[in-house]
């Protein structure tokens, strides 16, 4: 992997940390909603993610925000969002920072 590729991945993670579920004061990355980010050599990115619940009322907003933020990263040519509920999200997927913010630690 070259430095430019690694920089793109870091920039994507940085942008994902600016996406919030409107009902929870923690970003989607630290909530554990992002399962995988695949950056292709061609600049196309696939984000595999979930939501806290299948019937999340903010689903469309969150998914579109993820897409727009990732597309804004230098070097990204396009973004595909794969929404999955396998495995089902649970609070153990959160980062330590998220658990502290939400009072679980």
From Swiss-Prot:
Q: What's in the misc comment field?
A: The grpE-dnaJ-PG1777-PG1778-PG1779 genes are co-transcribed and may form an operon.
Please give the SUPFAM superfamilies that the UniProt record associates with this protein: Fe-S cluster assembly (FSCA) domain-like
Family affiliation: Belongs to the Fe-S cluster assembly domain superfamily. MIP18-like family.
Partners and quaternary state? Putative homodimer; may be disulfide-linked.
| PANTHER family for this protein | FE-S PROTEIN MATURATION AUXILIARY FACTOR YITW
Effect of loss of the gene: Increased sensitivity to hydrogen peroxide. Increased incidence of spontaneous mutation in presence of hydrogen peroxide. Slight reduction in growth rate. No reduction in the ability to accumulate haem on cell surface. No change in Rgp and Kgp proteolytic activity.
Induction statement: Induced by oxidative stress due to hydrogen peroxide.
Question: According to its UniProt entry, what is the function of this protein?
Answer: Iron binding protein that protects DNA from Fenton chemistry-mediated damage caused by hydrogen peroxide induced oxidative stress. May be involved in iron-sulfur cluster assembly.
Q: Which of UniProt's keywords are assigned here?
A: Disulfide bond, Iron, Iron-sulfur, Metal-binding
- One Pfam family this chain carries? FeS_assembly_P
Q: Does the entry feature the keyword Metal-binding, yes or no? A: yes
Molecular function GO labels:
iron-sulfur cluster binding; metal ion binding
**What name does this protein carry?**
Fe-S protein maturation auxiliary factor PG_1777
């Amino acid at each position: 992997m070259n430095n430019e590729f690694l920089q793109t991945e870091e920039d994507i993670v940085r942008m994902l940390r600016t996406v919030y579920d409107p009902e929870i004061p923690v970003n989607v990355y630290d909530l554990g909603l992002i399962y995988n980010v695949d950056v292709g050599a061609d600049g196309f990115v696939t984000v595999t993610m979930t939501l806290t619940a299948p019937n999340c009322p903010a689903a469309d907003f969150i998914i579109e925000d993820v897409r727009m933020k990732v597309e804004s990263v230098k070097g990204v040519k396009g973004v595909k969002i794969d929404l999955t509920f396998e495995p089902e999200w649970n609070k153990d997927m959160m980062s330590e920072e998220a658990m502290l913010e939400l009072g679980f630690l």
